[in-house]
């Protein structure tokens, strides 16, 4: 299955799985989690706080960034 989502205003296509969760975007979108670049990591799907295990679907709008 293939879906396209928007990550930080950039279209990203996920391929190779039957279903996807938030954490799967890290396989397709370059975001460094190894170094803290703020006080907290913000993870949203369609404007709502998301956990890494949250399912995502076609057209989801995803924000992931460090907040100070």
Model-based region annotation:
Residues 1-68:
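Ubiquitin-like/PB1-type beta-grasp interaction modules and other compact soluble beta-rich domains
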């Amino acid at each position: 299955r293939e879906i396209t989502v928007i990550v930080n205003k950039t279209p990203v296509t996920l391929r190779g799985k039957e279903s996807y969760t938030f954490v799967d975007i890290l396989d397709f979108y370059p975001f460094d989690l190894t170094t803290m670049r703020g006080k907290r990591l913000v993870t949203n799907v369609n404007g709502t706080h998301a956990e890494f295990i949250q399912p995502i679907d076609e057209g989801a709008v995803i924000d992931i960034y460090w907040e100070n």
